[in-house]
Structures are given as structure tokens and as C-alpha cells.
């Protein structure tokens, strides 16, 4: 049966069939952090804080647009004065907006232990003077997830918005994390927290995870009219 989202147990199967520690770690981070493939592949050893049990995610989907706090004019990183209203661009203002491109996320002990083992084994790859956790490109990341899905015997998924059927991809692990989070806490505060965790600029993007193949509406209706004992319909 074709469905829209993976279950957490299915993602765990992906991890179990991974070919090596690197591939298992990639699957683990994509799911446990709910990060984008570009963010996972951009991780460096310096982003891992073993003492505080955190990972700093660099938001790579799009560069944050700096803007004037007075007139909202778009600013370049080198601007010291707004080209539209002439207001001075304080360094602290630019740095504050720049920090919004990062998310510092807590990590569970099991995942942290896996990261530590991977680093101690010499897994990270040096590029341009920096140690990247994975050192692979986006295409290879997709290949790893797809190969794990085939090996685990997972079905293809259907896009709930377009109806198109597609293979299991890295982003589907992010989807799984988000759906699981909403199922456990769909309060206003919970959705806001998820928005911040996922790095969504628009909360509308986060809200779509509440619409899981119509199940939410069905559950709501059944709470209004609960089935009586013995009903077969």
C-alpha cells in the first residue's frame, strides 16, 4: 500500500541495514535532527559540542536576507548605512540577523555516542582546512538513503499534495520527524517549537505536517461521534 509518510520504525530499519557506520550516522542525523540533506552534509566536526550535547546546524537552503530595521530595505553585508533611509546599520544588528541562520539543537546520548565513535575512527573528511563529518556530495547522500530503503524493503511514498509517487529520499526522513513531533504535540506552542527546530521561515510550511493524509480530520470526527461497542461499520 502506498502511503505519504514513513513510520519511525521504518526509519530504524533503514539505519539497521546501512552498509557502514557513516551511512548509519547519516540516516540517524537526518531523522533525529530532522535536518535537510544539505545541512547534514555541511556539518563539520567543529559544529559538534560533545560537552554540551549539541549540534549547530548551518541553514544552507537560502542565504538570510539582511534588512533595515527602520524601513525594511534589503541590505548587503557590507552596508554601514541603509541606502534607502540612511539609517546606520549597527554591527550588532547584522550579527543578530546572521545568527538566525544557525540552529543549535540538543542531541540524544545514543546519537552523540555514534558521532563520537565515528570521529574517533577517523571518519570525517578534510576539505579546505575544515573537517567535514561526511565529505560526500548531495547525490551520494541520496544514493545512500535510496539503497537503504531498497534493502529494507520499504514501499514508495506518495506526495500528499501532488499525488505523485516517489522513492524514499533524505527529505522523507525529515518529514517523518516532523509528523511524529506533531502527533505527540500539536499545540500552538508545539508547532512554534517545531518551526524553530526545522528552520522554517513561514509557519505555514510547518502546519502542513498536521494534514497527514486526512487522518487528522477523521480522528477529530470520530471523537465527536465515537463508535459504539459492536459497531462493524
Residue spans for each PLM region:
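Short, charged phosphate-coordinating catalytic segments
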Residues: 30-52
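Phosphate-coordinating loops and pocket residues in cytosolic domains that bind phosphorylated ligands
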Residues: 8, 16, 42, 50, ...
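C-terminal secondary-structure termini that scaffold catalytic or DNA-interacting sites
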Residues: 2-5, 73-92, 224-233
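Catalytic-site neighborhood detector that most strongly recognizes the C-terminal catalytic loop/helix
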Residues: 198-223
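Flexible interdomain linker/hinge and immediately adjacent N-terminus
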Residues: 1-12, 58-61
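C-terminal catalytic core of Y-nucleophile DNA break-rejoin enzymes
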Residues: 63-77, 81-86, 93-117, 127-150
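Short, basic (Lys/Arg/His-rich) helix/loop patches that form interaction surfaces
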Residues: 16, 123-128, 143-196
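Basic, Lys/Arg- and aromatic-enriched nucleic-acid-binding interface segment
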Residues: 8-33, 37, 126, 185
Amino acid at each position: 500500500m502506498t502511503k505519504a509518510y514513513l513510520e519511525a520504525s521504518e526509519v530504524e530499519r533503514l539505519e539497521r541495514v546501512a552498509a557502514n557506520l557513516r551511512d548509519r550516522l547519516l540516516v540517524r542525523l537526518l531523522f533525529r535532527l530532522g535536518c535537510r540533506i544539505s545541512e547534514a552534509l555541511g556539518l563539520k566536526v567543529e559544529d559538534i559540542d560533545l560537552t554540551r550535547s549539541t549540534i549547530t546546524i548551518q541553514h544552507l537552503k537560502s542565504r538570510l536576507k539582511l534588512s533595515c530595521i527602520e524601513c525594511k530595505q534589503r541590505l548587503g553585508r557590507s552596508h554601514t548605512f541603509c541606502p534607502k533611509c540612511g539609517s546606520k546599520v549597527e554591527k550588532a544588528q547584522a550579527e543578530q540577523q546572521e545568527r538566525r541562520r544557525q540552529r543549535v539543537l540538543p542531541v540524544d546520548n545514543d546519537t552523540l555516542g555514534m558521532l563520537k565513535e565515528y570521529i574517533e575512527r577517523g571518519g570525517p573528511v578534510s576539505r579546505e582546512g575544515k573537517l567535514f563529518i561526511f565529505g560526500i556530495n548531495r547525490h551520494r547522500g541520496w544514493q545512500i538513503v535510496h539503497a537503504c530503503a531498497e534493502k529494507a524493503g520499504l514501499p514508495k511514498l506518495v506526495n500528499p499534495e501532488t499525488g505523485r509517487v516517489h522513492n524514499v529520499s533524505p527529505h522523507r526522513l525529515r518529514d517523518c520527524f516532523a509528523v511524529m513531533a506533531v502527533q505527540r504535540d500539536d499545540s500552538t506552542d508545539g508547532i512554534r517549537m517545531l518551526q524553530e527546530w526545522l528552520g522554517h521561515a513561514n509557519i505555514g510550511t510547518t502546519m502542513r505536517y498536521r494534514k497527514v493524509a486526512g487522518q487528522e480530520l477523521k480522528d477529530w470526527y470520530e471523537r465527536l461521534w465515537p463508535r459504539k461497542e459492536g459497531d462493524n461499520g
